């Protein structure tokens, strides 16, 4: 059961985790450096990446549906998408999906869309539905919150 579904069953409102918390959590678990300068256009830096894709953008979801948009100028090479789950009362775990920017461009262009701004607005894509559920990612890692 997903975290938001469990919260909804007990009469609560869906969870929205602070972005800074999610970015710091992923940085800690993945051994990244957390970047706190928004002007740089990415969230984390991987000092151990040998492919030279060291700049990482973090997006997340606590429910089934997610809609993400991207800055007009993309400064990163890897997207880490985080899905949070709550399977039991004592353990909350999450998955981190590693998606290359080239994969995002290829998949959105197949459907005649773009991640870049058009008609004065940024397009929104569902990373879960349009990429992850279709197996469009490089790697998946699972972690426990506690």
Specify the residue positions occupied by each region the protein language model found.
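Nucleic-acid endonuclease domains
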Residues: 1-55, 59-146
């Amino acid at each position: 059961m997903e975290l938001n579904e469990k919260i909804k069953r007990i009469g609560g409102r869906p969870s929205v985790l602070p972005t800074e918390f999610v970015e710091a959590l992923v940085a800690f678990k993945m051994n990244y450096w957390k970047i706190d300068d928004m002007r740089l256009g990415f969230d984390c830096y991987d000092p151990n990446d040998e492919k030279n894709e060291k700049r990482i953008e973090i997006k997340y979801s606590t429910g089934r549906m997610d809609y993400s948009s991207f800055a007009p100028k993309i400064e990163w090479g890897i997207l880490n998408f985080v899905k949070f789950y709550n399977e039991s009362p004592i353990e909350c775990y999450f998955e981190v999906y590693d998606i290359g920017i080239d994969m995002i461009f290829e998949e959105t262009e197949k459907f005649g869309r773009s991640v870049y701004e058009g008609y004065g607005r940024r397009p929104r894509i569902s990373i879960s539905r349009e990429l992850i559920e279709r197996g469009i990612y490089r790697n998946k890692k699972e972690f426990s919150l506690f």
